[in-house]
Amino acid sequence: MADRLRSQAKLEQLQARYVGVGNAFTTKYEWMVNQHRDTLSSVVGHPPLLAYMATALGEPRVQVRKNLLEKMIMPCGPPPPSNQF
């Protein structure tokens, strides 16, 4: 019983601290967008990863960084249509 309460408290703490963890009402699209944005921001924020990607793509680091930042706006395309009226 104590382990379950401790786990629930830890999950609530993570959800309060990090947006990408989600909750029971997080849709699949929101979760995917959060994961993609977290990944892109990690690549932009770590210069060695950015240099690796720039080398692999054969483009300057500044251009790759700009492209990744632009991709963060809508990383998974437009949101699916809502069924709410």
Curated annotation (Swiss-Prot):
GO terms for cellular component: cytosol; nucleus; precatalytic spliceosome; U2 snRNP. GO terms for biological process: mRNA cis splicing, via spliceosome; mRNA splicing, via spliceosome. Transmembrane segments: none annotated. Belongs to the SF3B5 family. This is Uncharacterized protein C211.05. The lineage of its organism: Eukaryota, Fungi, Dikarya, Ascomycota, Taphrinomycotina.
